[in-house]
């Protein structure tokens, strides 16, 4: 997490805390998800800046509460549109490209490690087993690191071993996870990072709204119960301002 804990901003957007939720995030995968970390860092920094701007504008004697709110909202929108949202969109898109590409790698065909005759005998043996026994035998070969048996089955059309395409796809993924663990780890990391970016966009937008704030309308019994009857948002203020400016249009 950031050295300085800022309670004004949700911990869900802290870059270190966010990356810490990715199980496979370490030195091996950090470079592949760096775009996500950068996006979170910029969001966190920008939200702190919005809170700071709100505190500073409150000291401006030339602006009333409505003017202060609009000034903060203008600053927030410029910052988010110019810096934060583009970073999040780019991070999500780039991570998704890797997910798509590596998902294909995880189910690509393999080359048989055995001779044609041995491969044929292995496939014939597997085809003679019952479906459950067949899947179990191939999975066991993969877990045992027996590339000869596994590749003999998966390096040929599925029907030759008594499999269908769906079964073969499942086994191919299992094969690549066993024999290419680095790729499997990277895929898990970028998938988690993409889902994190996409899933926390709603948190980001809520935090922007919270940082900018609204004008609270005091209820008739505010002095007694401390209750507000409503609020005025920056959008509502802008609409009223623009409407009042129409008579001055040239």
Tell me the role of every PLM-derived stretch.
Residues 40-57, 91, 98, 102:
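Non-transmembrane amphipathic alpha-helical segments
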Residues 2-45, 52, 132, 182-189, ...:
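Polar/charged low-complexity regulatory segments
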Residues 3-38, 69-172:
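Long, charge-patterned amphipathic interaction tracts in eukaryotic proteins
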């Amino acid at each position: 997490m950031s050295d300085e804990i800022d309670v004004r901003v949700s911990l869900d957007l802290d870059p270190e805390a966010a990356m810490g939720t990715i199980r496979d995030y370490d030195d091996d995968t950090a470079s592949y998800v760096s775009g996500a970390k950068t996006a979170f860092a910029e969001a966190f920094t920008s939200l702190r800046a919005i809170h700071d701007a709100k505190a500073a504008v409150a000291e401006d004697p030339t602006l009333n509460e409505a003017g202060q709110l609009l000034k903060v909202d203008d600053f927030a929108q410029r910052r988010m549109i110019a810096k934060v949202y583009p970073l999040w969109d780019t991070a999500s898109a780039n991570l998704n490209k890797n997910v798509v590409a590596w998902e294909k790698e995880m189910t690509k065909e393999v080359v048989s490690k055995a001779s044609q005759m041995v491969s044929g005998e292995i496939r014939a043996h597997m085809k003679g087993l019952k479906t459950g026994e067949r899947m179990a035998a191939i999975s066991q070969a993969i877990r045992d690191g027996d590339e000869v048996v596994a590749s003999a089955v998966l390096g040929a059309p599925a029907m030759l071993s008594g499999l269908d395409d769906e079964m073969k796809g499942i086994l191919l993924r299992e094969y690549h996870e066993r024999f290419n663990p680095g790729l499997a780890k990277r895929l898990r990391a970028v998938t988690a990072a993409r889902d994190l970016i996409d899933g926390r966009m709603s948190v980001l937008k809520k935090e922007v709204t919270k940082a900018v704030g609204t004008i609270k309308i005091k209820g008739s019994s505010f002095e007694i119960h401390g209750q507000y009857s409503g609020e005025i948002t920056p959008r509502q203020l802008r609409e009223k301002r623009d409407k009042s400016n129409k008579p001055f249009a040239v």
